[in-house]
């Protein structure tokens, strides 16, 4: 590329001079400063690449000269193009590839190809009271962008924990200067006792696989101009069972003992961490004998149908891929807590029952009192007695106080006299003649009293 490291004359005002390239690169730079944003620029093959350059000075300048050189390792720098003030003098071999717009010292490379990779040197000379020079070097790399990587797993059917191994390989169709990195759950994977990598880092070996190796794996591929990440892939690892335990929806659990209320139906659930899912079996233990009562992860026990108050069970989990199994023992104790709760519930309702009973008693009493007031049963009885025939009254005898009590049946009527001390009781029989005069008033009173007794005096002999 370009001519040798000797410069041609640039105009009559500068005069004729020749020097070697390395002398130009290390010229004086007092009062002149050349800067570049980055000393390394990465370009994409087939695209344009812009190399920005800035310079400044503080002295009067009559002429500004800009020179671009290109060098590769172990080769001499080659001239690309130069300018004095606004006049550009390109190398005819590359006049359509490199572009510069003085006094701007930046360089445009279009299109960028792999041979364009190397070091680009820019030198600025200022002519005034003297000549000031400064230069910068920019390293340019050229790459193809990375295409999306694809990860393959071997064996694709999976591996058994502590028995099988697994290999993950990252494939990329396009890209240069590729750098591979493996990620697990979004974090970098490092070398360990089970992880190892190929020299290019595009292959990950896991030997042997364990449950902890389960996760989302991806391959990140990058180069100076791009990066791409593969789709997430999860290796299949068979493990377990781990952490076998039994839980229930009811009852109290203390250790391996479940306390269940009498009359409750309790559902037990047996679970363990495993892949693929386990096969569960429920075993009942009685009198040193065991027998399988059910298959599946759940068991329902109806406590009211169980004759024993204490029952022993075993839940067994088996993984048919790993060939491992585990079991857990537990005891079920049936108590009468449910009945006590029911009795307490009845006691809690007793005040309400008492109030209800008292209310019913009062209502019934009021109804009976109302019926008694309305119909008065004693009057009915009296009317029936008064309506008896006279023959029954004739049978009644006077009260003498000495006859047999069986002969005293009859109807009596007693009268209270105002003067009890002055009047003596007169029997219902006839009064002697000696007493008739003194007891006339009394007799008439007695007669009025006893006249209510039908025909009792007529039947008495005179």
UniProtKB/Swiss-Prot annotation:
Signal peptide: 1-31
Assigned keywords, A-Z: ADP-ribosylation, Cell cycle, Cell division, Cytoplasm, Cytoskeleton, Disulfide bond, Glycoprotein, Golgi apparatus, Immunoglobulin domain, Membrane, Mitosis, Repeat, Signal, Transmembrane, Transmembrane helix
Domain of life: Eukaryota
SUPFAM superfamilies found in the cross-reference section: Immunoglobulin
GO biological process: cell division; centrosome cycle
Annotated protein name in UniProt: HEPACAM family member 2
Cell compartments where the protein resides: Golgi apparatus membrane; Cytoplasm, Cytoskeleton, Spindle; Cytoplasm, Cytoskeleton, Microtubule organizing center, Centrosome; Midbody
Cystine pairings recorded for this chain: 170-219, 270-315
InterPro entries named in the record: HEPACAM_domain, Ig-like_dom, Ig-like_dom_sf, Ig-like_fold, Ig_sub, Ig_sub2
Membrane-traversing stretches: 352-372
Tissue spec: Widely expressed.
Function: Required during prometaphase for centrosome maturation. Following poly-ADP-ribosylation (PARsylation) by TNKS, translocates from the Golgi apparatus to mitotic centrosomes and plays a key role in the formation of robust microtubules for prompt movement of chromosomes: anchors AKAP9/CG-NAP, a scaffold protein of the gamma-tubulin ring complex and promotes centrosome maturation.
Domain Ig-like C2-type per the UniProt entry, residue ranges: 149-233, 235-331
Primary localization class, coarse: Golgi
Species of the source: Homo sapiens (Human)
Pfam families: Ig_3
Topological domain spans for side Cytoplasmic: 373-462
GO CC annotations, alphabetized: centrosome; Golgi apparatus; Golgi membrane; intracellular membrane-bounded organelle; midbody; mitotic spindle; nucleoplasm; spindle
UniProt PTM comment: Poly-ADP-ribosylated (PARsylated) by tankyrase TNKS during late G2 and prophase, leading to translocation to mitotic centrosomes. N-glycosylated.
UniProt membrane topology term: Single-pass type I membrane protein
Residues that carry a glycan: 85, 129, 165, 320
